[in-house]
């Protein structure tokens, strides 16, 4: 990590609850690959059914669909979904290699890794 990049990239999974199997599988997929990138990545599970995750879920939904889309047309972020630095990357559980490629792409773009 070079001096200009002291912040880790943020990976967030929109997570409804433990009874949501796709949410569990998305969480497991991320937890399986992030140890490889641990010094560059921060992981957060946005549990939007809890008060602690509601605001972030709405914030990410507004970034996708705008205020009107969320509040007038009831459009929200897909569940489960995966965001990297606030950008939607996956709206379904990605294969391991695709998730690793996406993380590495963001790490390269942000100067954490060299482009090989």
Label each PLM-derived region with a short phrase.
Residues 2-46:
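Local sequence-structure signature of Cys/Sec-based thiol-disulfide redox active-site neighborhoods
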Residues 18-21, 51, 89:
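Short acidic, S/G/P-rich loop/turn micro-motifs used as interaction or catalytic elements
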Residues 23-27, 57, 93-96:
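Conserved strand-to-helix beginnings and helix N-cap segments that scaffold or border functional pockets
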Residues 29-36, 52, 73-76:
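Cysteine-centric redox/oxidoreductase cores and disulfide-bonded domains
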Residues 39-60:
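Thiol-based oxidoreductase modules, predominantly thioredoxin-like and allied folds used
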Residues 59-76:
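Glycine-rich, highly charged phosphate/nucleotide-binding loops
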Residues 73, 77-115:
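Non-catalytic, surface beta->alpha helical segment in thiol-disulfide oxidoreductase systems
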């Amino acid at each position: 990590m070079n001096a200009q990049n002291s912040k880790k990239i943020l990976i967030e999974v929109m997570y409804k609850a433990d009874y949501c199997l796709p949410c569990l599988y998305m969480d497991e997929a991320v937890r399986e690959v992030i140890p490889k990138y641990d010094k560059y990545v921060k992981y957060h599970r946005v549990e939007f059914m809890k008060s602690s995750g509601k605001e972030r879920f709405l914030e990410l939904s507004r970034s996708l669909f705008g205020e009107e889309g969320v509040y007038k047309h009831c459009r929200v972020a897909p569940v489960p979904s995966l965001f990297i630095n606030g950008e939607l990357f996956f709206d379904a559980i990605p294969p391991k290699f695709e998730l690793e490629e996406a993380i590495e792409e963001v790490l390269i773009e942000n100067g954490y890794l060299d482009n090989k």
